[in-house]
Amino acid sequence: MGHQESPLTRAAAGGAAYIKRLRKVLSWRELGDGHGNLEAEASPGSVAVITRAAPRRATRSARLPASRPTRLCRQARLGTDHPPARAPRGNRFARKRNSAGQITIQGPAPPHLGARRRDEARGARAAPLLLPPPPAAMETGKENGARRGTKSPERKRRSPVQRVLCEKLRPAAQAMDPAGAEVPGEAFLARRRPDGGGGDVPARPRYSLLAEIGRGSYGVVYEAVAGRSGARVAVKKIRCDAPENVELALAEFWALTSLKRRHQNIVQFEECVLQRNGLAQRMSHGNKNSQLYLRLVETSLKGERILGYAEEPCYLWFVMEYCEGGDLNQYVLSRRPDPATNKSFMLQLTSAIAFLHKNHIVHRDLKPDNILITERSGTPILKVADFGLSKVCAGLAPRGKEGNQDNKNVNVNKYWLSSACGSDFYMAPEVWEGHYTAKADIFALGIIIWAMIERITFIDSETKKELLGTYIKQGTEIVPVGEALLENPKMELHIPQKRRTSMSEGVKQLLKDMLAANPQDRPDAFELETRMDQVTCAA
C-alpha cells in the first residue's frame, strides 16, 4: 500500500528527492483517506476491518474463515434478559470471535501487531516526563449499595489495568527517555539551542507522571502534572515501532486537531510531542515541512517500521484533559438510578455527537468505556474520548464526484464508510456489513442510553467487571442488538426490557427510532438533539 521503494533506491535518490516524492504521495493520500485511514467505497467483496477490545484498542485483520466458528458461551441472566428473537437464525455471514470479544470480518491482513510491552515497575519516585519548551525553529502549531439484583450474563472482554502507584513508574519514563535514567527528580533533557548554536541547554521537566490509569495494545495513559501550572493532565504514550499504532494515533491526532472550537463534552486535546533519541519536538498535523511528520505518515501508509527501533525507541505523547471521575460504566453503576442524571447525560451525549458530526467527524467507537466523567464544576460532565477509530469526512466525496479538502458543506450522513470497526455490543447492523454512514454513531448512542436507563449489563468473564450493554437473548446466548437486527431486520425491540422500569413514551419511541435496523429511519444528530430536549426520562 502506498509508495514503495527499496532502501537502495531511497539511498540513491537522495534525501531531498525522496522527501519530495513522499510529499506527492502524501498529498494524494490526504485527498482520499486522511493519512492512512482509507475509507474505500463499500463493496460486498472485501471489507477492511479494525476490531476493538475493551478498554483500549487492539487492531487486527483476518481472512474470512471457511466456516463459522462456534460462538463463545455467554451465560444468560434470568429474569432480565431480552425475549428471544422471533425469527429463526438464518444464514449469517461468516466471522470469527476471539476470547477478548473481538470480531474479524473478511479483509486483507496487515502486518502482525507489535507485541505489547509492559514497562518494569520499580523505584521510589514519580518519573518526570521530560518535554522541554520547543525552540522557535520547531513547528508549533461511591455511593455504596448502588445496584442489587440478579447476576449479569458473562462476556469475555479485556478490562483496564488497575491503577499503579506513582512510586513504581520511574522506569517507564526512563524507557521513554534515556536521559532520565541517570538523573532522578530534577532531570534535564538535551536539546539544540534555538539559535542553532552548539552545546546542550538544560530543560525543565514539562510534565511529571503520577500514575498509570489505562493500558492497551494501542498505548499507555498516565495521570500527570504540568510543571509550570501544576494542572493535572492525561498523557497518552504511543510507541511508534508498530505501523498500526501510528495509524491509530494519526487518526486521533487529525480528529482532535481538526476541531477549531472547544466543546465541553469533548475531551480537550492540548498538544502532541514526538520524542526520539532523548529529544522532543512538538508536532502539528499536516505539516509537510516536518521530516519527522512525513516519516510518521510513511509508516502508516507503507505498513512498515520507519521510526523507532529497540536501540532508539520513538514515542508519540498526546497531552489531553484529565477526567478524574472515571468512565460512564464506573459512574453509573456505582450510584442509584436518577432520572435527572439520566436526562442530563442524554442531553450532553447528543450535544457532543451533534458537534462532532457538524465538524465532519464520525466517532465509530462510542461506548461507555470511551465516555469519561469530570466533576470539577460540582456536577458530572461527560467527555467523549478515544478517537483512534474516528473518521474525518472532509475531503471525501459522494460517488462520482471529486473530493474537496476545503468543502465546508460536508454531510456526514451521506458519506459511506467501509471499515467494519467498533465494539460489537454497540455496532449498528450496517457496520457488521461494512457499508455505513454517521448514522452508526446514532445507533451506538441508542444502545448506551438504553443500557444506562435500565442498568442492563453483562459481566466480563475474565475480570468479572460489570459493563453497560444491551443485548438480545437467543437461547442460552446473548447477542449484540446490531447483529440480531442484521439477521432479522423486522425483529421488534421490547423497550423497556424490564417490566419495572419507569420510562416515558417519548423516550421509548426515541430509542426505537435510534435503534432502527434501517439507518435511513434513524434521526440524524441534529434532529436527535432537538427531540432529546423535549422528552422526559421517567413516566
From Swiss-Prot:
Keyword Kinase: yes
Keyword Nucleus: yes
Amino acids binding ATP: 213-221, 236
Reaction(s) catalysed by this chain's protein: L-seryl-[protein] + ATP = O-phospho-L-seryl-[protein] + ADP + H(+); L-threonyl-[protein] + ATP = O-phospho-L-threonyl-[protein] + ADP + H(+)
Enzyme Commission number(s) from the entry: 2.7.11.1
CDD domains, alphabetized: STKc_PDIK1L
Keywords carried by this UniProt record: ATP-binding, Cytoplasm, Kinase, Nucleotide-binding, Nucleus, Phosphoprotein, Serine/threonine-protein kinase, Transferase
Residues annotated as the enzyme's active site: 365 (proton acceptor)
GO cellular component labels: cytoplasm; nuclear body; nucleolus
Annotated compartments: Nucleus; Nucleus, Nucleolus; Cytoplasm
Family to which this protein belongs: Belongs to the protein kinase superfamily. Ser/Thr protein kinase family.
Subunit structure: Interacts with PDLIM1/CLP-36.
Protein name: Serine/threonine-protein kinase 35
The organism's taxonomic lineage, starting at the top: Eukaryota, Metazoa, Chordata, Craniata, Vertebrata
